[in-house]
Amino acid sequence: EDLKGVIVLAATNRIDLIDPALLRSGRFDLLFEVPLPDLKTREKIFGIHTRKKPLSKKINLNKLALKTEGLTGSDIEFICRKAAMLAIRQTIDKNQNLAAEQTAEISISEKHFEEAIQLVLNQNVIKK
């Protein structure tokens, strides 16, 4: 049965990972590549994903963006989530009896971001 009015839309910034058989003529009406985010865009992505997180006052989003050239928006989102989890884990390890009101002590530091960035960079090296 023919599907009428169905549009399939997909986007990627890793077109190099798509099977060439899918990219042959006639498979898609239109192909376009979404480029990797530039420095300014990476900084904005960090801002979006850290907006409601307890960051150390020393965190410089531009500095983080400089260290993440070649990474995707989803990589940066993962870095922010991982850095937050590292900060939580560190706080809990320091104080096993952490009370709910003590969660205000949690602060995501540059060290947490460095560790998260390194994890993503190592994963990207393994993929390639």
What function would you assign to each model-found segment?
Residues 1-128:
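AAA+ P-loop ATPase motor domain of ring mechanoenzymes
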